A protein has these predicted regions:
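A detector for small-residue-rich transmembrane helices and their helix-helix packing motifs
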Residues: 1-234
Length: 234
């Protein structure tokens, strides 16, 4: 289901969220498209680098950052940026600009590390040489924080061709379960091409990280939705 809006107004202009979206498009338009596969080889993250530096275009400690701004095609970047545009602004409101920026990168790192661990433990040597790229792990962390902060927010989405409105906990909870079970299926059926090329456990890891961090900070009173935002989903 494609999300259309969440109905919660931003407290202030989401500077960091817009900057992240702009940076992703800039990298895609001015680095990836002109350079093609060479760009992917140069700036993606390879799980095998953590183990034995099998690719080494960049040190893996740098590549996990550059990989967050790389995408496999127009559908990949448009889908990711749509989710970030809809859900990221309200999470930025709660975390603050600097906190949101740190959270985004930390979520991306957590997502990449879980996917890498799963690949190295259960995958083949060939799997470990497949480039990991995309902002979806960091965005999954944003979704995990959102479901904790705004569980009853109404998400307008397309069901086939019909717009419907459902609670965020249903929409994002369903999204998470889909990622988890598709990832589990991929582990149990490695020769099957269903979901091939999708780093499902990066999505799972990012989402869990985001939800845990948001829950801890919310309980500690370090972050909170504004009164206007609370009123939007009562």
């Amino acid at each position: 289901m494609i999300p259309l809006s969440d109905g919660i107004p931003s407290r202030r202009f989401p500077v960091v969220n817009i900057a992240l979206i702009a940076a992703n498009f800039a990298v895609f338009l001015f680095f990836e498209l002109p350079n093609g596969e060479a760009a992917v080889n140069q700036a993606s993250f390879y799980p095998c680098d953590v183990d034995n530096a099998c690719h080494s275009a960049l040190p893996w400690g740098v590549a996990w950052i550059t990989a967050m701004f790389m995408h496999a095609g127009w559908d990949h970047i448009l889908g990711n940026m749509l989710f970030l545009a809809i859900f990221g602004n309200n999470v930025e409101d709660a975390f603050g600009r600097l906190g949101y920026l740190v959270f985004d990168f930390a979520g991306g790192f957590a997502a990449m590390m879980l996917q890498t661990g799963i690949t190295l433990l259960f995958g083949t040597a060939a799997d470990a040489q497949i480039p990991n790229l995309g902002a979806s792990g960091a965005i999954a962390a944003v979704l995990g924080a959102y479901i904790v902060l705004y569980p009853k927010s109404r998400i307008r989405t397309l069901l086939v061709w019909f717009p419907i409105s459902i609670p965020a906990w249903v929409y994002l909870g369903g999204w998470f379960l889909y990622q988890f079970f598709e990832g589990k299926y991929a582990l149990l059926h490695p020769s099957n091409e269903r979901g091939s090329g999708v780093a499902f456990f990066a999505h799972v890891g990012g989402f869990i990280f985001g939800a845990i961090v948001a829950r801890i900070l919310l309980a500690a009173g370090r972050i909170t939705p504004t009164e206007t935002q609370r009123a939007a989903y009562r």
